[in-house]
Regions:
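A long, amphipathic alpha-helix that forms part
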Residues: 236-250, 257-259, 266-307, 317, ...
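Acidic/histidine-rich catalytic neighborhood
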Residues: 302-303, 311-364
Length: 527
């Protein structure tokens, strides 16, 4: 019974937080001994990034019109607004945040999704995709993947995060409730006692993050913010906690050159109630007001800091009927031996499925399984929107469900897109909804599809097929979570891929309206 209780408690924390506590008492002591100045006092306006999970343009505009988002309305009217910024792919938070922090797609930062299979380790990697899935595998491994492996191992060490790049230039930064946070400062994460009591988990885990680090109940900057770390407030993984931690840095005049603050609440509400809900945006705006109020007035806030408010991904509405909305590809692949989630992968297994809501990786772990045969079987499902694989020459081949056409491409060539990327293309371009005019590529309903899909197809080792489903549908596999009648993301479609961006306090903007280009722009802002 004790082991079961430990598992339940651990999962409740893991799935809500994906992190552990830093030694905040020591940190605060060090900060009081070594007082810092804000970036503005050092002659440069600090940059504050507010990342609102699943923030979308249309519901944001509606919330503003109804008077439910006055803070975002103020920043928008004081600055610039871009309703369609392209996210990363898969449109899952860990991959998107890795793109935001590194300025690269998944082929360079190596975080393929929330769920994926490591051919090297011969096991599934889950960062907390849902209780049903996590309960079927080694829970302590899930815990370790989320709190340590994601940032310290799986995020490519050869690709600098913005925290690392700023530290290398003598600049300071802060991460507040962000999932991806790797930096140059070592922190000792204190594992909760009920987990540390297990002989498999150490009491402390060493990680690296930015100078100023806050992560829900386990890494608290503001000693007075404990009320927001209670179990009924998701142990600190909430907008109010994030806002008060950021306001604390402002009030203490310790705001560094860059602060990245994550507001998670809107995502959960959009998943449950659908992408048109406004409640999550209203709550996020209230949290933003807390941060702005720390300056005394909102006008002073804009004068003294550069503000960047953006979403990470959109969401597509999922149909209300479970049978109609869910796409289970296991029956299509039924004559293969599909690995079970609750068992180690064996030499007898042939296929592994890693579902990320509206996309999935299908791995052929048996060398006798031909990927092209897997694709042919998948084509029998007409709800599949994109089916992609690499051929023997590293070309990416794309088809669809119930469609015999083929599109193939690879980087480099005579065709150039709006982002200055060049490609070699052949076959049916309508499969990825691009049009060509004088060797110029124009994207349609799949923004920056060539680079984003290329990123996922080269994000990690192994032989695999990438699939996505059409809007309204969600992929399911063994025990994966569903969002019937709510919202889901993960795909390349514009509904999942386009997010709004508010900029206030500077007249500049990223060189392109893509999350992948925000890092370089921020680096210029804090030079």
């Amino acid at each position: 019974m004790k082991n079961k209780v430990t598992v339940v408690l651990m999962l409740s924390l893991l799935l809500l937080i994906l992190g552990c506590r830093a030694d905040s008492s020591q940190k605060l002591k060090q900060q009081s001994v070594n007082p810092h100045h804000t970036a503005n006092q050092m002659g440069k306006k600090p940059v504050i990034v507010i990342l609102i999970d699943s923030l979308m343009d249309k519901p944001l505009q509606e919330a503003i019109q109804e008077g439910r988002a006055p803070a975002m309305r103020f920043l928008l009217h004081q600055g610039q607004y871009f309703p369609q910024v392209v996210s990363s792919f898969p449109t899952m938070s860990v991959t998107i945040d890795s793109t935001l922090l590194t300025g690269t797609y998944a082929d360079q930062h190596h975080v393929p999704g929330l769920v994926w299979y490591s051919d090297q380790k011969k096991r599934m990697i889950l960062y907390g995709n849902g209780a049903k899935e996590a309960l079927k595998i080694d829970q302590l491994q899930v815990f370790n993947d989320a709190i340590y492996q994601l940032n310290q191992v799986q995020l490519n060490k050869k690709t600098k995060t913005i925290h690392e790049a700023l530290a290398d230039k003598g600049k300071e930064s802060a991460s507040i409730n962000a999932i991806v946070f790797r930096g140059r400062t070592e922190h000792s994460l204190k594992v909760p006692r009920f987990i540390a009591n297990s002989n498999r988990v150490p009491e402390q885990v060493k990680i690296t993050g930015p100078k100023w680090f806050s992560y829900a109940t386990f890494a608290q900057l503001d000693p007075g913010n404990s009320w927001n770390t209670s179990p009924w407030k998701k142990f600190g993984m909430n907008d109010e906690f994030s806002a008060k931690e950021t306001a604390f840095l402002i009030n203490q005049k310790k705001l560094p050159n860059l602060t990245i603050t994550y507001f998670p609440g809107n995502d959960n509400l959009a998943h449950r109630k659908g992408p048109t809900q406004l409640e999550g945006i209203e709550k996020a705006d209230q949290a933003l007001q807390t941060v702005l109020n720390a300056y005394g007035s909102w006008e002073e806030a804009v004068q003294n800091a550069t503000w960047i408010v953006l979403g990470d991904s959109g969401q597509s509405a999922v149909y209300n009927d479970r049978q109609a909305a869910t796409v289970d590809i296991r029956p299509l692949l039924g004559h293969y031996r599909i690995a079970k989630l609750n068992q180690p992968v064996t030499n007898d297994d042939q296929i592994v499925i890693a579902a990320n809501e509206r996309m999935a990786y299908i791995y052929a772990i048996d060398n006798n399984v031909d990927l092209s045969d897997v694709v042919k079987l998948l084509q029998h499902e007409n709800k599949l929107d994109i089916i992609a694989m690499k051929d023997g020459k590293n070309n990416i081949q794309v088809t669809k469900g119930r469609n015999g056409s083929l599109f193939s491409y690879h980087p480099g060539g005579k065709f150039t897109d709006e982002y200055g990327q060049s490609w070699t293309l052949s076959g049916e371009t309508n499969l990825v909804d691009i049009t060509l005019n004088n060797n110029r590529i124009k994207y349609g309903k799949y923004p920056d599809v060539l680079a984003r899909l290329h990123g996922a197809m080269n994000s990690h080792e192994g032989r695999y097929v990438v699939i996505t489903v059409q809007p309204g549908y969600e992929l399911v596999s063994e025990s994966s979570p569903t969002h019937i009648g709510g919202g889901a993301h993960g795909s390349l479609h514009e509904q999942d891929s386009l997010v709004p961006l508010i900029i206030s306090g500077t007249n500049t903007r990223p060189k392109t309206l893509r999350i992948v280009d925000i890092k370089d722009w921020i680096m210029q802002l804090v030079k």
